[in-house]
Structures are given as C-alpha cells and as structure tokens.
Amino acid sequence: MRGIDFIAIDFETATGRRASICEAGICVVRDGRIAETRSWLVRPQGNVYSYWNTQIHGIRPDDTEMSPDFPEVWTEISEYLRACPVLVAHNAAFDISCIRSSLELYGLDKPVVTYYCSLRAARKLYDFRCNTLDYLCGQFGITYGRHHRAGDDAEMCARLFLREIKDSGSPELEEMVFCNGKL
C-alpha cells in the first residue's frame, strides 16, 4: 500500500473528563507499513483517577506521579503530526474529543489534521455483531497486545485500518471519506 501514511492514535483517561489523559499511544504507518509505535504515561491535571477508569486500563496515580503532563507529551506527538497530519482512531469521536479538550485546558494551538475513524469504517464495511477494537482484531486474526493500553491499542487500530483500506477497494486513503473529519 504505497503512499498510505497515517498515525493511529489512542488515549486512556484517568476520569470521565476527556482532558484527563493518563496515557497516549501512537503508531506511525509509512507506505502502508508500521514504522514505529510509541506510548507515554501522562500525568493528568491533579493526578486524580476514578475507580472505574483504573479498572479499565489498570493505570494508577503512582504510575503517573512523575510522568510528563499533556503539553510535554503533545510537543512530541506534534513532531510526528508535522511529518504526517493524518490521524486514525477507533471511535475517533472519543480520541479527537480528548485532544480538543486537552488542547483547550492547556491553552495549546489546534493543529491542522485530518482524521479517520476505524470504527465508522468497520460499520460501513462489515456486518459484525460487535465492532469493538479487540473483537474486530480477533475476527481478522490481528494479534492483540494489552487491550486498553494506548500504545497497543494504537497499533491494533493501525493494523485494522490497513485491513479496512484493503477491504474497501480504495487505493487512496482520501477515498475513505465515509469515515473522516478535521480536527
């Protein structure tokens, strides 16, 4: 899939607030191949966690006590976005709202980015009873790491979206217009 470049992204949050990012993960895809996967623990404002969120991802205040805050991590992620301003997320509405809320909370500029949603693509392309990331990866034999850990989820999202591009018959990422938006 030459010419298919994007960054799959995933966030875990400490509470129900979208700006409470406690882990960020990216998976860089260049020419249709995974080039790099990274994740960062992030100290959310106040380092406060809800019981329910911790039960989902297992990240605790002790894990992020000495971690960088969102602006520091976003500076690193922004370097990747300058090279490739195309994001993909599974349930992009959640992840994009995390970005928007965090940028607003910290008074940071919004980048010019196009995003695609692998969940919307799955709903359009397939007729599965369930469209969660782990279920879809299981259906396609995509090996899964630790579910609800941002780096692993970002990589699985990238692998799934590459499959969706192939299954859509679209040789160009831009043709996946049924699942995109602007940050």
Residues of each region from the PLM?
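Conserved non-catalytic scaffold segment of RNase H-like nuclease domains
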Residues: 1-112, 127-130, 134-148
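Conserved catalytic/binding loops enriched for acidic/polar residues
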Residues: 153
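Buried hydrophobic packing segments
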Residues: 99, 121, 157-161
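Conserved beta-strand -> loop -> alpha-helix junction used to position metal-binding or nucleic-acid-contacting
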Residues: 109-122
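Short Asp/Glu-rich motifs
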Residues: 73, 156-157
